[in-house]
Amino acid sequence: MSDNEKSTQTEEPNFRYNAALAQDIENKWQKIWDEQGTFWAANVNGDLKDGKGRNAEGRTAYFAMDMFPYPSGKGLHVGHPLGYLASDVVSRYHRMKGENVLHAMGYDAFGLPAEQYAVQTGQHPRVTTEANIANMSRQLHRMGLSFDNRRTFATIDPGYVRWTQWIFSRIYDSWYDEDATNPSGSKGSARPIAELVAKFESGEKAIPGHESDGKQWSDLTDAEQQDILNDFRLAYISKSPVNWCPGLGTVLANEEVTAEGKSERGNFPVFQRELRQWSMRITKYGHRLIADLDGINWPEKVKLMQRNWIGESHGASVHFIVATADGDKDMEIYTTRPDTLFGTTFAVVSPEHHLLENVPAEWPADVPEDWKGGYANPVEAVKAYRLAAEAKTAKDRVNEAGEKTGLFTGLYATNPITGAKLPLFTADYVLMDYGTGAIMAVPGGDQRDYDFAVKFGLPVIYTVTPLPDSGDDLANYEGKAPFVSHDGIVINSSVEATEAKGDALSLNGLRVDDAIAKVNAWLESAGVGKGTVSYRLRDWLFSRQRYWGEPFPIVYGEDGTPHLLPDSALPINLPDVPDYEPRTFDPMDAESNPEAPLSRNEDWVKVELDLGDGKKTYYRDTNTMPNWAGSCWYYMRYIDPTDTKHMVEKDEFDYWMGPNHNKYSGDEGGVDLYIGGVEHAVLHLLYSRFWHKVLFDLGYVDSAEPFHKLFNQGMIQAYAYTDDRGQYVPADEVVEGPADASGEPTFTWNGEHANREFGKMGKSLKNIVTPDYMYENYGADTFRLYEMSMGPLDESRPWNTRNVVGGMRFLQRLWRNVVDETTGQAHVTEDTPDEKTLKLLNNTIAEVTAEMEGMRPNTAIAKLIVLNNHLTGLKAVPRAAVEPLILMLAPIAPHICEEMWSKLGHAESLSAEPWPVADERYVGHDTVTAVVQIKGKVRAKLEVPVDIDPADLEKQALAAVADRLGGKEPRKVIVKAPKIVSIVPAE
């Protein structure tokens, strides 16, 4: 044989489906989709009404979206797009059902991640962020994601920043009226601050601090009015304990601090400091944020995480009087156990509590020395203790196992029921931002209070005893430990009626729940407390001392009074300055103070403005909003990012997100499908719900919730490898060797032994596989197919590049069934499929449709492979069978399906082709394929009834393989009707 003949025989056919052809096909169809606006979603009105002949009228709206990415790194690895691919499959499927699908992608570009990346590279955040967006956009486009790119935006776009600041302005200019009815029909609603002012002006609502001095609202100065309104606004300024992170140079919200008291990003120590900051009054929405979870289709684990984070508890607000040199002061405490008031033997306030400004100059008489902490007077003691508390993290302060510290303040509080004089301590385990910053201590029923009481020699009174039938006895605890129980019989809890204390009260003999109800009624009638609801949730700390964030639309006058800028002044853009890096400190420098980068730009900070009373000098707020601000509402901007007149136009909102806009979201409305990680359960998802509810109350949107259905995708994990020093080595350079004695595979790198571990995919682990690598070596369709076939979408799964080839082979077999590899032309038959093919085809259509509805693409793929394998075994592939197969595969592997569809003679893209519908005449598995195995190897296949008798199946199986048994009776036959017969032959 000549060399020329050998070469001819080994050449690949011109139209074999391989990585090179896949890339050509994918680039071709992506260009066509872009040019033809294939994935344009049609709005009702406006610039985005054009749907390329597929307009909104008469079509059901379906809104599917992903949690948009941070463009803070160098791009994506194959673990990132799992959710994006899932939402794309769903979107393509719904388009083929004839629905008007809104599917778009934006970029969450402000905030700490982008700024830190810019610091690492030495470039301005805008430069690096825009470069990262361009790279990420390229990667996503190459993946074949069916986005309407007219709707793409980044949160740093001035047009987007304008509306983020506009929403802040609406929140700032609102208060929460507990008596107002919200649009859902329940009590409590955000209302314009002007309505509160009107109530003050008319006298309908008493002016705080002026209930008895006769002053009218008009008698107050502007600064006095603003101070009062600040206590009601949903966005407000306060001097309060915050999480100060010197290592990052900024304050953090509670949600951004780990359980170890470190920053979520960077793992720096976090300290409690009292600083003047912006906050949002999310606590006003605590009950609604819990109650409305019942109406949305979210994973139960996420709902539980939000319920626990919000932490609704029922108890009582109780007022204790604290005598000071400046007169009696009110100390409000919240307790879930008001039944234990009779067991209160001391009280404790946070080191940050305002009452500590009123400590006496000298110690009272007869104060034990160990209460004083070694200090000459209460003023020195409190000052020193406050400094010590500031140096601790919140985690350290509440650590149950840690040593209990504290000292006496020199003040006493009066128990409102018993009239007992209670020493008032300060202790760092009481946090100012939890409850009221003050607690009543009941050492007989609480371990922490008991430990504190033992340390300082304070009395212990037990007010609850075990239930008679519990098998327990109070004697087991007295003098040894507290009796901690939420049920039991109340004891030692009665007081006679006196003029000072009011009516008599006895809780003795009652169960705890009954005692709580009775004491709450007594507190309210006596005017010293009432039953109330409290939340673990704290108000949302909303300002950051960073450069890369949205500026606040606020300026301050010479007297420090804040003024909201008019909407016409928006957006307030960041000045483009070189000095953007935050001032960071030694991570352990708790005494450091934030320095906002914008404060260094005096030309920007100081402005001359006319806000309606003549031109004056004002000073801009130099804080910026947290990175959560832009992500709180971005889903609404997808509806029309070209609209310059509205955040979102009402008719468009109602079409895409309003109640009853389709059958999926029903009465609730909201985004029909939102895919993203569970790690955002108590951050982005909670904040978005809060903002949305404020806008709902104010009439800007018509659904009470932003996201009707939430789906949490799993994580793609990967193997990583280390050498014997424990250093990570490149995973793609590791060679797998033969199994060791235990049966486990061995691995080498550069000829040396390597160890394998399993976990995340990451740059530091040197096991990253990029989408670009997949495009080049397999094509985007194979990549999509592999990710969708790896397992259930909501479960984590291991990445193994070696397994990708299985998906490629499936696509190659399908391609060969449709396309002649030599000519590139379709070679299907127009003949009607046989009965067996029709049954398999229509059952596959029914089953794959159910899998797509249930977001189970992995099992849908498995069924499509079975159908394709059947077609491969036919002499000629019927068009009537393979075209439905192509349509069903199209949402998962769209490019190759478009190409095959085109070669089959169709002029239009299959993206809007109707989804196949099963012919019910052929649906139903009346027969199945039974496999006959001999010594574990398949030797025959039988088509048998699904209800075949096991004995009959055994007879048919033995007959089918009789020649292989050599006329001998088998030693053993195992029948698992109707699908498997395993035969062990005679020796």
UniProtKB/Swiss-Prot annotation:
Motif ('KMSKS' region) on chain: 760-764
Compartments in which it is found: Cytoplasm
Binding site for ATP: 763
Record Pfam families: Anticodon_1, tRNA-synt_1_2, tRNA-synt_1g
Extent of motif 'HIGH' region: 69-80
Enzyme Commission code(s) on record: 6.1.1.4
Reactions this protein catalyses: tRNA(Leu) + L-leucine + ATP = L-leucyl-tRNA(Leu) + AMP + diphosphate
Record's keyword terms, sorted: Aminoacyl-tRNA synthetase, ATP-binding, Cytoplasm, Ligase, Nucleotide-binding, Protein biosynthesis
Enzyme class (EC, first level): ligase
Domain of life: Bacteria
GO molecular function, one term: ATP binding
HAMAP family: Leu_tRNA_synth_B
Family label: Belongs to the class-I aminoacyl-tRNA synthetase family.
Protein's name in the database: Leucine--tRNA ligase
Species this chain originates from: Bifidobacterium longum (strain NCC 2705)
